[in-house]
Amino acid sequence: MTRDEFIQVMGDLMILAFRTDLTRVATIMSSPERWGSPLKVHGLFDKPVDHHGMTHGQGNQHVRSKLESLDHFHIQQFTSLVMKMKDIKEGEGTLLDNMMFTLGSGISDGSLHIYTDLPTLIAGGAGGAIKPGRHIKSQNGTPIANLWLSMINAMGVNIDQLGDSTGKLKLS
């Protein structure tokens, strides 16, 4: 099974679980994050590659181009699943209107193992609890846990702290 097929099958299972109310929370790991794990993406790489190793070669334009292609691939997969959720009617809106679907990474600069300024994309409206269509730039040093805490609060779970959170982000 190719990586895109795998992501779409896992996404379809996630959507089915949401539609049948089997769960309200799901995670899809689109690629292995273990060091040295071979990554094969049909049409992108001729043979399996070491994604982790590639991130340490960002100074090489050829490697950087491959990494950018891989990022584009993940955005395409995310978008495909978002469009499926947008097409599913649910109550007065759609499945996407009533949920939050997040794409992110655990590292912002793989060559230096930097885990701040993490690019994160949220699709959906959480039943009106978040305002879509915006770019939010947090202050330097803001932990990603602030986003997770804010998302949990948007889902109706009223807690004040999560991991190393230092506050909440304004999502609405």
Locate predicted features.
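Ligand-binding pockets and gating/stacking loops
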Residues: 1-172
